[in-house]
Swiss-Prot record:
<comment type="function">
    <text>May act as an adapter to facilitate the interaction of SnRK1 complex with effector proteins, conferring tissue- and stimulus-type specific differences in the SnRK1 regulation pathway.</text>
</comment>
<dbReference type="GO" id="GO:0008270">
    <property type="term" value="F:zinc ion binding"/>
</dbReference>
<dbReference type="GO" id="GO:0005634">
    <property type="term" value="C:nucleus"/>
</dbReference>
<dbReference type="GO" id="GO:1905582">
    <property type="term" value="P:response to mannose"/>
</dbReference>
<comment type="subunit">
    <text>Interacts with KIN10 and KIN11 via its FLZ-type zinc finger domain. Interacts with KINB1, KINB2 and KINB3 via its N-terminal part.</text>
</comment>
<dbReference type="GO" id="GO:0009744">
    <property type="term" value="P:response to sucrose"/>
</dbReference>
<keyword id="KW-0862">Zinc</keyword>
<protein>
    <recommendedName>
        <fullName>FCS-Like Zinc finger 14</fullName>
    </recommendedName>
</protein>
<feature type="region of interest" description="Disordered">
    <location>
        <begin position="85"/>
        <end position="108"/>
    </location>
</feature>
<feature type="compositionally biased region" description="Polar residues">
    <location>
        <begin position="85"/>
        <end position="94"/>
    </location>
</feature>
<dbReference type="GO" id="GO:0005737">
    <property type="term" value="C:cytoplasm"/>
</dbReference>
<dbReference type="InterPro" id="IPR044604">
    <property type="entry name" value="FLZ12/13/14"/>
</dbReference>
<feature type="zinc finger region" description="FLZ-type">
    <location>
        <begin position="181"/>
        <end position="224"/>
    </location>
</feature>
<comment type="similarity">
    <text>Belongs to the FLZ family.</text>
</comment>
<dbReference type="GO" id="GO:0042594">
    <property type="term" value="P:response to starvation"/>
</dbReference>
<keyword id="KW-0539">Nucleus</keyword>
<keyword id="KW-0863">Zinc-finger</keyword>
Length: 248
């Protein structure tokens, strides 16, 4: 007659797999070690289950692991915290919302303007004093001469401050104009050339009209012809002496 053999190795195998912290899973091992061997043992198991019903078979420190998750949690308890895959938690009202690093709700135009000024590398502060009351107004302008209103500036809102009027400023006083002295007046009639068309001859003579330039060109050509005739005249050539004997 064959009898059923019990399996006492179940407890030992489980103990080897989990052999890190036996005290944590002690109730679990108690159930495994007391496997039923006779019909009378079935009456003992309910008592054990009732005795351990108030205890949880997993520790909260193991991240809520159940079943085989206890083995993995015990093996990694010294390194990191394991959480169950299917674990769901309700929304906890005690948790705080994420911190908002940038909040534009409470910012004002003055703060934006100050931030814009700090970002500018080159800027100019212009302070205007109004009368004997002592009140003053300060404006900020960038390196291009535009007034800084706020951090968000459109091109149509900009207002240029440093503008040079080339019409009202006399070009005769500028150093560039002083270096070009021949452009001040006509070379022939000495008429002022400011604001008029200028006709250049040979890059160094300026004239007020084509007539003056043509007259000067004609005079230069006449002088050139005279010099050429004078250089080829026999009277201006050197004396020629022939070798010979003077007989008296």
């Amino acid at each position: 007659m064959l009898t059923k053999r019990t399996h006492p190795m179940i407890g030992k195998i489980s103990e080897l797999l989990v052999g890190v912290n036996r005290s944590t899973a002690a109730p679990f091992f108690d159930v495994l070690m007391t496997s039923p061997k006779s019909p009378l043992d079935f009456k003992i198991l309910p008592q054990i289950s009732q005795r351990n019903s108030s205890k949880r078979f997993y520790d909260d420190n193991l991240g809520g692991s159940v079943g085989l998750g206890i083995v993995a949690a015990l093996e990694n308890s010294n390194t990191r915290r394991i959480t169950s895959v299917c674990r769901s938690e309700p929304n906890q009202p005690g948790r705080s919302d994420p911190v908002q690093f940038m909040s534009h709700g409470g910012s004002t135009d003055g703060e934006d303007e100050e931030m814009f000024i700090m970002d500018e590398e080159d800027y100019t502060l212009v302070t205007c004093h109004h009368g004997p009351s002592g009140s003053c107004n300060t404006r900020v302008y960038d390196k291009d001469g535009f007034e800084c209103f706020s951090s968000k500036i459109n091109d149509d809102r900009r207002e240029r401050l440093f503008v040079v009027d080339v019409v009202t400023e006399s070009p005769e006083n500028s150093p560039e104009f002083q270096g070009l002295g021949f452009l001040n007046s006509c070379y022939l009639c000495r008429k002022k050339l400011h604001g008029q068309d200028i006709f250049i001859y040979r890059g160094e003579k300026a004239f007020c009209s084509t007539e003056c330039r043509s007259s000067h060109i004609a005079n230069d050509e006449r002088k050139e012809r005279c010099r050429s005739k004078f250089s080829t005249s026999p009277y201006t050539a050197g004396q020629i002496f022939s070798t010979g004997v003077l007989v008296t």
